[in-house]
Amino acid sequence: NGTEFERMGNASDLFAAFTYIVPGMPMIYTGQMSGNHHRLEFFEKDVIDRVENAPQKALYKGLNDLRAANRALWSNEKGAPMIRITADNDNVFACVRQKSCPKHGDNTVIAIMNMSAEPQTVTLDLTNLAGEYNCLCGKKMNVESTQTFELTPWKYIILTK
């Protein structure tokens, strides 16, 4: 029970992104895109505190746009299976989802997530995944066959092509 901020604190954005990366259908509950910090009454009419420029609005828009545009993240047989990437750090979750489509080309999503409240360093074996990617943050990133990432607490990197 409680809001996502009460339950997850600073990890709420990471776990929102996680639900978009793993197979299945991500759920957005009433008030999440507004950054609602108010517990809604159960089975009662309640008011949502809407924050116009809530950071969650941009977060969920970016995640929704990514999921719509990249076929690897689609649900069921239309999407791609999730494959864990071998990491040398148990606090970091890393995976790839790849989907080839003759009509729409190759779709690849790499996710690297620090699942802890401490800074983490991880080296990943990205053999066969090397190349230039778009980062969800809006920048381009070159991925090497073996690459080390420095991640602040609850930080995630989502790379696509």
Predicted segments — roles?
Residues 8-9, 13, 23-28, 32-161:
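Carbohydrate-interacting/catalytic domains
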Residues 1-6:
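Active-site clefts of carbohydrate-active enzymes
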Residues 16:
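Conserved glycine-rich, hydrophobic/aromatic-active-site segments
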